[in-house]
């Protein structure tokens, strides 16, 4: 049988191909920043704050996030409490969960670890998620932002940190509160 729809078939092949190439090119920049090396001074995050040669307007802080069934724990690595604080707990639907307080406008490099099974911390409002696998080093860049101009006033703005990888019976209750403030 003779193929009379060659132009249509070529269009069905070429147009999606061009679209995929364009989307790949367009998204390469943001993906590259998500996995930027903490040792790259040319990345948007700069060098670690407090290291020699860092730019105070372009630097990041290192924090630790540990997952275990069915709880999050945070380590602010001795940072000032106005930049990072993890000493409080709050009631969330009848469950006491940890509160991570972060300062707006700062960058955080979070070293992720898991003590038991695979977990996946998801910072809901920040749009970032990464797997925490036992025995495997993984990290996540966090740039806390506020949706309102005054960042929630004295209380700050809160968002949730949820686990998106099924990790057992109480997976649905594995949450933390992330509070972003600008004072």
What are these regions (language model features)?
Residues 1-183:
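Non-transmembrane, membrane-proximal soluble domains of secreted or membrane proteins
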């Amino acid at each position: 049988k003779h193929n009379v729809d060659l132009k249509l078939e070529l269009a069905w092949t070429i147009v999606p191909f061009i679209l995929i190439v364009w989307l790949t090119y367009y998204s390469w920049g943001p993906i590259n920043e998500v996995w930027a090396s903490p040792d790259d001074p040319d990345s948007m995050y700069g060098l670690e704050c407090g290291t020699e040669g860092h730019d105070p307007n372009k630097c990041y802080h290192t924090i630790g996030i540990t997952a275990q069934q069915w709880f999050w724990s945070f380590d602010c690595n001795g940072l000032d409490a106005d930049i990072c604080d993890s000493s409080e707990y709050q009631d969330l639907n009848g469950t006491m969960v940890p509160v991570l307080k972060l300062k707006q406008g700062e960058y955080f490099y979070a070293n992720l670890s898991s003590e038991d099974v695979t977990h996946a911390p998801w910072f809901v409002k920040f749009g970032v998620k990464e797997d925490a696998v036992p025995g495997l080093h993984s990290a996540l860049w966090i740039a806390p932002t506020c949706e309102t101009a005054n960042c929630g006033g004295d209380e700050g703005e809160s968002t949730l940190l949820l686990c998106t990888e099924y990790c057992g019976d109480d997976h649905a209750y594995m949450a933390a509160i992330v509070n972003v403030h600008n004072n």
